[in-house]
Amino acid sequence: MTNVFADLNLHPSDNRGHLLTEKVNPKSECLDQLTTESLVTLFCEEDREPQRAVAAAIPELIQAVEAITDRLRSGGRLFYLGAGTSGRLGVLDAAECPPTFCSDPDLVQGVLAGGSAALLKSSEGLEDIEQLGKKDLEERDFSPADCLVGIAAGGTTPYVKGGLAYAKEINALAIAISCVPIEQAELPCSIDIRLLTGPELLTGSTRLKAGTATKMALNILSTCAMVRLGKVFGNRMVDVAATNIKLMDRALRILHDLADVDRVRGTELLQASDGSVKVALLMHTCGLDAETAQKLLIEHNNQLRTALARCKNCIA
């Protein structure tokens, strides 16, 4: 029978017990003896830590948003790279960008060790192959114009370190997200986001607080970058892709809220604009046809507010 432990080629120096994410949380040492009420209460109280951790990383998050926006505005793409929970969170955030912001599916991509199969069935062993991170990026034509966010809660994942090292090697933007102090694990990157959520209630289970903080950070990075790119007007997702009943309703409500357009007229405008809320707003507000409205948007880098400012009697 194959000795899987021998195959892993572990060494005494591989002990990860010093990492913050692997330490024992004294608040939960009697976790298995708690009542259901006490369990739920403890988890709710401990889940305040991700918010504190993300708030402490605001300076690095600002730097990352601005750098990502610059790259995307210049034609680059954003990649999330990770294994296990970290990789799945990247895939989740990337998958939400096209319906929310009508972005090209290639603009924001989630790269998970093990590929799509690892979304449903764990392939955690692949995270130990450092060269695989580089290989997965190369297969997607990752270039110096692009951005990489490497996600590794414990800061030691070889797959992620390999991807980040490759990004730095070719002068792409390399951003790291981890949940341990830099003195415990260094990562090759230009922007280092440390979300120090502390030991997990279930020791080592970084799908908990570390995962929550990571998801919050990814929400901030993608959403703020899209805001800076002009895909939002006020707090409305004016680049929403009206691809189902819920999103069509949202598009119609945006038209009503911003331009007092009733649902019948709104439907007509969306049909004429091929589902574009921005074009529909310009058509209605400025009395333009769809083609002219689209050209006006392009002239203003798809920034609705500046395009509206060119029109008389506009709502900007």
From Swiss-Prot:
Short name of one Pfam family: GKRP_SIS_N
Keywords carried by this UniProt record: Carbohydrate metabolism, Lyase
Superkingdom of the organism of origin: Bacteria
Family in the record: Belongs to the GCKR-like family. MurNAc-6-P etherase subfamily.
Function: Specifically catalyzes the cleavage of the D-lactyl ether substituent of MurNAc 6-phosphate, producing GlcNAc 6-phosphate and D-lactate.
Quaternary structure and partners: Homodimer.
Protein name per its UniProtKB record: N-acetylmuramic acid 6-phosphate etherase
Organism (species): Prochlorococcus marinus (strain MIT 9313)
